[in-house]
Amino acid sequence: MSALRFRSDWKALTYLACATGLFVLQWNLAEVHVPLVILSCAMAYGTGCILHNHAHLSMWHNKPLNVLTDYWLVLLRGDGAYSWLPTHVNNHHRFSNHPGDMTLTYRFSERNNLWNLVRYIAVGGVLYVGAVFVYIASFRVRHPRRFWYLLSQILLHWMFVAVAVLIEPEKALVFIAVPQLFGVIAMVST
């Protein structure tokens, strides 16, 4: 029996390895190559798709491998399954774009335009962050190990960003912040 739940998860792992390799390549190049940054942004969106699937059903039968995958996704994407569980899995699939769904797409209007997109991202971002903090905090007393595990993912991401900023601030902005923000905004927008 394979450690992976599905053979197709090899594609996801290959994709994550390529995204990681692209980051390492760019970081080690002397200058910024815009086509590679654009590719990183596109791959950040794809990483979000993998994260979405991993939040619904983890890739591995083996818990330690799922933990490593969680940390890997956090480093590549900037958020983890901890943010998808309260906002998407436990909320969106429960309310399905009806009142109570924090991802309600027609909160302001049925029209598809830039203004509604900006409002959707701004309001959704506030709702998402609040839901994630409440979700993580809910484990503090009942399941402290889970609480610290979820918190460790956030801390790992911010330590990664902080170290990158200390080493090369411009590279941290272009190779970490830009693709991660693009990936999140593109995912929320689709």
Which residue ranges define each predicted feature?
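Non-catalytic, topology-defining segments of multipass membrane proteins
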Residues: M1-G46, I50, V67, L75-A177
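Active-site His/Glu-centered metal-binding helix of metallohydrolases
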Residues: H54-A55
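Activation segment
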Residues: S58-M59, S96
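Post-HEXXH active-site segment of zinc metalloproteases
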Residues: W60-V74
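Short, surface-exposed linear patches
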Residues: Y71-W72, Y106-R107, I185-M187
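Alpha-helical transmembrane anchor segments
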Residues: K171-T190
